[in-house]
């Protein structure tokens, strides 16, 4: 596994990001020296279709350990029906953070467009896919 929790362990990694209220005490991190690291997590299965295109918000935080000099890029994707890297499912939304420079946690809060929200057909099968690239 190329992702670790806040104590540099790959055991119980989901426990570091499973809160419903933001906590910066625990987190996940890509392993040092890895050119590309992919982490995928399924969103809670209790999400119900809100029958609305409004207020579909994705929130996450990111930062860089500035002790390393390498450029770090981060890609965050919302996917539906992800199975594996060979079966990525449907891309609903994506963003790129190029050349992260700050060691201070930055909070991203992205509201899906109506078109993106309406393209979700299975709320019980949504995944966040995170790619860390060291350049």
Please annotate each region the language model reported.
Residues 1-38, 94-101:
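Flexible, small-residue-rich N-terminal segments that precede or flank a structured functional core
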Residues 49-53, 116-125:
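Short glycine/proline/serine/threonine-rich loop/turn segments at secondary-structure transition edges
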Residues 77-83, 131:
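Predominantly extracellular/luminal cell-surface or secreted proteins
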Residues 129-135:
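Short beta-strand-plus-loop segments that form exposed binding edges in beta-rich domains
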Residues 24-51, 108-112:
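Short beta-strands within extracellular/lumenal beta-sheet-rich domains
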Residues 37-68, 128:
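A short beta-strand element within beta-rich, extracytoplasmic domains
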Residues 88-118:
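Extracellular carbohydrate recognition and processing domains
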Residues 67-78:
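Beta-strand acidic-aromatic groove motif in beta-rich domains, primarily in extracellular
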